[in-house]
């Protein structure tokens, strides 16, 4: 397993964000594959991403991870619309299911201790260590 290293600015950015998009996929009984991407809340501890949810055990992402542990995750935003200045990090990784008592779902009206834990194995980032587009003014 590859140990992805994040720059200090990437870690600062990741810890400032609250929403990610996770993509999962699994083969259904009829042999078809339907990718699924959803916005999710997350925790990041510097090594792993933790994705929970009020009904995580019934979610498609949870069921997909049980069948196929390969996932993709994107965390992005816009620093500015004018000038256009996007930033973000895209990752491929492997996922498993863990129980943790101190995750972000503990603070919700419906605490849940089960999480999808994602170990990034490959990453791409843009606009974090330096601007994506520089102004021509």
For the regions a protein language model found, what residue spans apply to each?
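Extreme N-terminal tail/first-helix region
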Residues: 1-20, 137
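C-terminal edge-of-domain segments
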Residues: 99-137
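A structural signal for short, well-ordered beta-strand segments
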Residues: 42, 93-95, 120
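Short, structured beta-strand-loop surface elements
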Residues: 32, 56-114
